[in-house]
Regions:
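Low-complexity, highly charged intrinsically disordered N-terminal segments
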Residues: 1-57, 67
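Acidic catalytic cores of enzymes that act on phosphate-bearing nucleotides/polynucleotides
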Residues: 28, 32, 91, 185-191, ...
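Glycine-rich phosphate-binding loops that contact phosphosugars or nucleotide phosphates
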Residues: 48-204, 271-281
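Generic beta-strand/beta-sheet core signal
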Residues: 60, 84, 109, 139, ...
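Catalytic-loop motifs flanking and including active-site residues across diverse enzymes
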Residues: 68, 170-174, 242, 289-293, ...
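A short, gly/pro- and small-residue-rich
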Residues: 121-130, 422-423, 430, 437
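C-terminal amphipathic alpha-helical interaction region
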Residues: 342-347, 351-352, 383-386, 426, ...
């Protein structure tokens, strides 16, 4: 498809630009920088009402509901804003110990309103915080289970998402803007940058979004399916968000672009470098939109629907099956790092899936594992579970069978009960680890499971 026709097809909401299925129903993100501006004053008043009552804010969310806020938190250096997207009991306890719950505000964020982790976090802090409805708000799509819960409990506020926007395209919707305003970010300036980029992405020539997507798509056709996303102090955290956008949008039907934040291209024949243009934090508004447009363009090159996620549910179903047994999963160790590396072939990548407590020390240990794979000539991606299941999980199951998957586990510690559930966070994260590895094996993926102590 020619440049002009592809760009026009996107703006005309023409599903035949991709596969001719339901793509036209998922293009609300194209206009959201205009629409969300209309509700900005209400969001500002809400945030101002909390100023004297709140010391910390905790966002409970996964995937598209958490990654844009995490990028904003890091970029604007807001240390009192916390993103909770782990089910590890030790991590949840560690966060709770930092907080004065009487002066902590909770944002429960989920488009579907049924995200298991988000609901579990919300219910946990609802109970431990004394059921103080004025210290909770929800961001969710209209009519969702979470909206009904929030209104039943009398949450301080409920902000509605736009149903025609998928989670990974929601950075410039209330899912990104409500947290931004709570952080004290000038959301009007963020959105102004996004609108400027939106206008630039309408043109046939000098279109920043098309140019980036064209590089992605052309590179894929030439065998360069791995996207090395530049990492600098200024764009810290952006790769986490871009990783989900690329992986979940393109990794399906045996195809896919493999995002690798912070990895070097080094002239490797299967890699391409992608620069990130964020000279200062407010440039995120433009960059969010540019990358969304680019990935929509790349989807046309790959001839896939960049707005669905057909393989994400499989691991969730496996997790639920494990939980339904009522027993603690037996996470038997399988294989080793060396055995997994021995299976590497040309064009493969090494993926670390860490169901362990996110800490600086564990970051270091995972870095040592990554170093071994890099020494073997492999590109490395890594993520903490269950965060990555809502980000790159679609690519792992639905993309090309070129990954070597190393699951890393630890001892999650004592059980931490989830109110209203027959299981706690310990059993939940173990079930997620068990379910994800089993799903990968069913898809014919090469896998191993080790304990983090093996990296010491």
């Amino acid at each position: 498809m020619k440049r002009e026709a592809l760009i026009e097809g996107i703006w005309e909401r023409d599903a035949t630009t991709w596969t001719g299925s339901d793509e036209a129903h998922w293009l609300g993100w194209l206009d959201e920088p205009l629409h969300v501006q209309e509700g900005l004053e209400e969001i500002r008043r809400f945030a101002e009402s909390l100023h004297d009552e709140v010391d910390d804010v905790v966002l409970c969310g996964m995937g598209g509901s958490s990654l844009a806020p995490e990028v904003l938190r890091r970029s604007f250096e807001v240390d009192w804003f916390h993103v909770l997207d782990t089910t590890h009991p030790k991590a949840i306890r560690a966060l709770e110990e930092k907080l004065d719950l009487e002066r902590t505000f909770f944002v429960s964020s989920s488009k579907s309103g049924t995200t298991l982790e988000t609901r579990s976090h919300t219910d946990y802090f609802w109970e431990t915080g004394g059921k103080r409805a004025e210290m909770f708000c929800a961001v969710t799509d209209p009519g969702s289970e979470l909206e009904h819960l929030a209104r039943k409990r009398g949450f301080h506020a409920v902000f509605a998402g736009e149903p025609s926007i998928g989670g990974r395209y929601s950075a410039l919707s209330p899912f990104g803007i409500v947290p931004a305003v709570l952080m004290g970010v000038d959301a009007a300036q963020l959105l102004e940058r996004a609108r400027e980029m939106r206008e630039a992405c309408r043109s046939g020539e000098g279109n920043p979004g098309f140019e980036l997507g064209n590089r992605f798509g052309t590179g894929w056709h030439e065998g360069r399916d791995k996207i090395c996303i530049g990492s600098t102090y200024e764009n810290r955290g952006f790769g986490l968000w871009a990783e989900q956008l690329i992986a979940e949008s393109t990794g399906k039907h045996g195809k896919g672009l493999i995002p690798a934040p912070g990895q070097p291209a080094d002239g490797a024949p299967d890699r391409q470098a992608a620069g990130v243009d964020i000279p200062e934090p407010y440039a995120l508004g433009a960059e969010f939109f540019r990358w969304e447009f680019a990935v929509a363009v790349a989807g046309a090159y790959l001839e896939i629907n960049p707005f669905d996620q057909p393989d994400v549910q499989a691991a969730k179903d496996k997790t639920n099956e494990v939980l339904a047994t009522g027993k603690e999963p037996d996470l038997e160790l399988q294989g080793s790092i060396d055995e997994l590396l021995a299976e590497a072939q040309e064009g493969n990548y090494f993926c670390i899936q860490a169901f362990i407590q996110p800490t600086p020390e564990n970051d270091r240990l995972l870095g040592e594992i990554a170093g071994r794979a890099e020494t073997a000539g492999l590109l490395v991606t890594n993520g903490y579970g269950p965060r990555y299941m809502h980000s790159t999980g679609q690519l792992h199951k639905g993309g090309p069978n070129t990954g070597l998957f190393l699951q890393v586990i630890d001892d999650p510690g004592d059980e931490l009960p989830i109110p209203g559930k027959p299981f706690g966070f310990r059993r939940l994260i173990q079930a997620q680890a068990a379910g994800d590895l089993e799903t990968l094996k069913e898809r014919g993926r090469r896998v191993a499971r080790i304990h983090i102590e093996e990296a010491i």
